């Protein structure tokens, strides 16, 4: 049991090139949705006050400029792979801890191209982890729709070294093996009694808690102009 409130950092993955989208600098991340850039919508959904640190990781100078305007920490890199983005974000978060006691207890990984993500869903992910932390449990928390898991994903500190050791184009989800998944809905916040022995890390002693989103569109990312048009219709529908 822990009486201390868990410290949670946030890493926003904003390095995607969006090759299917456009050649414009910033690609899909700066494409307007309802007059607001896709990435800016994601950042506006984050309850900044709930995090001990927030870092955007990108290859785009235009994204860095936007983050500076919003007073959000940004790390730029030139490496091509997903694991590079994770490693750069983890380095920024860990190096940002001046003292071992400042180290986060968990880190939430957010995709920069999910513009309809809501603050409600993010807060529910954080609270789900904090509830488990208070019970002395180590848990991964994932947003899902009808128990189909997606992003964001929150990883406990017990998995930080494995995240930093990822190679190639592997993301954090590749670490999840054979762990129990239990669902938690945003509306009733009732833990369901269904366990899914599927894709997680039971040998790490880490359970996976899935948190139901308010709509499937929260999990939808923007990979093409068609995706953007669909989300535009949802936004104004």
Predicted ranges, named:
Residues 2-4, 40-106:
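Conserved N-terminal catalytic core of the sugar/cofactor nucleotidyltransferase
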Residues 25-32, 71-75:
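Short glycine-enriched, charge-decorated loop/helix-capping segments at active-site entrances
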Residues 32, 116, 154, 221-222:
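Short aromatic/basic micro-patch
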């Amino acid at each position: 049991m822990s009486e201390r409130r868990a410290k949670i950092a946030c890493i926003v993955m904003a390095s995607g090139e969006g090759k299917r989208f456009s050649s414009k600098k910033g690609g899909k991340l700066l494409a307007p949705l309802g007059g607001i850039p896709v990435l800016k919508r994601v950042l506006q959904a984050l309850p900044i006050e709930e995090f001990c640190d927030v870092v955007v990781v990108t290859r785009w100078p235009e994204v860095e400029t936007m983050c500076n305007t919003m007073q959000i920490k940004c790390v730029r890199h030139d490496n091509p792979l997903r694991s590079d983005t994770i490693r750069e974000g983890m380095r920024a978060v860990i190096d940002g801890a001046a003292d071992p006691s400042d180290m986060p207890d968990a880190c939430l990984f957010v995709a920069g191209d999910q513009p309809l993500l809501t603050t409600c869903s993010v807060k529910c992910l954080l609270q789900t982890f904090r509830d488990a932390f208070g019970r002395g449990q180590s848990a991964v928390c994932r947003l899902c729709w009808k128990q189909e898991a997606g992003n964001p994903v929150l990883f406990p500190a017990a998995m930080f070294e494995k995240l930093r050791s990822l190679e190639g184009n592997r993301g954090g989800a590749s670490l999840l093996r054979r762990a129990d998944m239990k669902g938690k809905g945003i509306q009733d916040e009732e833990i369901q009694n269904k366990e899914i022995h599927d894709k997680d890390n039971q040998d790490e002693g880490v359970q996976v808690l899935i948190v139901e989103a308010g709509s499937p569109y929260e999990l939808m990312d923007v990979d093409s102009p068609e995706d953007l048009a669909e989300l535009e219709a949802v936004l104004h529908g």
